[in-house]
Amino acid sequence: MPRVCDTAYVSESAVIIGNVEIKGDVYIAPNTTMRADEPGSEIIIESGCNIQDNVVIHALGGSAVVVGKNTSLAHGCIVHGPCALGDKCFIGFGSVVFNCTLGDDCVILHRTLVKDVIIPARRLIGDGAVVNKQCIADRLSEVTVEDSDFVCRVVSTNLVLAKSYSKLRSR
């Protein structure tokens, strides 16, 4: 059964199935799907995350998806386990992340494929990139101050949304 902290906001149209843990101050937008329904699978969403509209998170049997603190999964992205995302990461619109480990503060922009690699902390992956070999992952550039500021703004905006929607629901 899913476990959801009482300070998290989960849209009524979100589908959360199986061994899923959602920690505090998390925003789960409409039409999100999280499935940890295969044997031995789990999904952990750490505090302060925002999971935007139409995101799909799925953990294969015997695997986990862990989304680090204050991480943003933007509209329509797919995160498929096994996968571990560090703290303060951003996964852009329509991106696919599968069988990966991302260090803290990584920014993956829109329509990107990241598969079967380990991404060091503070790396930037541009729009439409395909990172499916470790030699490509090892050559990624570092995020800029502007990239980090953008991620902080996204997290802050969605935390306000989560709190506002929670207040409306409790009326």
Positions of the model-derived regions?
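Extended, small-residue-rich solenoid/repeat segments and analogous flexible loops
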Residues: 1-33, 39, 48
